[in-house]
């Protein structure tokens, strides 16, 4: 069976539970081998933040500084698969100073899971990451309200956050995000539907990811858009920008706009690995 591949990212503010969610997802989809699980148990005792319980975030936080500080710094890529689809997920950092690492993860993603802490709701970094996802043309946005166990799985709290986010999404032009209440640490609504939130009638997070339609991926008919990942300056006579085109096409002498400044310029030359 030739299964489709979905690239997605997890993003949101610091401590909203991104790494824990993904660690749980990897564990539940049998993407963790027995030796990895043994190491996870040992690391949980040494570095964990969950007492005697397994700290699933440690499956993603690979740098020693990340484990010791309990944070994500670099973008961690992981692969897993189900009977229906293959996935490559980028776990991106929530701290403001690592935002450019998050943007790198967003530049190749088909979908984004934007996490929020049910106790805190929308924060500045939630908005920043949401705007970056929208700017990079990510069409499939899933807003996951995490840590629902800490608000006693309260339906009204979830609904209030949904309404707040809908207003924000409309203000930046984001269309039709999906919403799901979850608990990454307890596995509620991650792989299977939660018994603790029977009031929520939607599918699990994994089912939402499996059902994303990739047929509407960006085509050449749409305007040219390229997230800049590197400014090339090998010498004082040359300055170029590198990145992956995510829509449209570009030709020499075409006028382009640079965001967020909105300044306009023209394409002087297009250079590929084979030359101009």
Regions found by a protein language model. Give the residues of each.
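P-loop NTPase switch module centered on the Walker A-proximal segment
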Residues: 1-100, 109, 144
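C-terminal effector modules of nucleic-acid-centric enzymes and ribosome-associated factors
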Residues: 7-11, 150-153, 157, 167
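Residue-level signature of catalytic and energy-coupling elements of molecular machines
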Residues: 15, 21, 40, 70, ...
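Switch/connector loops and helix/strand junctions flanking conserved nucleotide-binding motifs
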Residues: 18, 34-35, 123-124, 150-155, ...
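Alpha-helical scaffold elements adjacent to nucleotide-binding pockets in ATP/GTP-utilizing enzyme cores
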Residues: 21-25, 39, 101, 125-132, ...
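Conserved Switch II/interswitch segment of TRAFAC-class P-loop GTPases
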Residues: 85-87, 92-98, 106-130, 134-159
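Conserved catalytic-core segments of large NTP-driven translation/proteostasis enzymes
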Residues: 159, 166-276
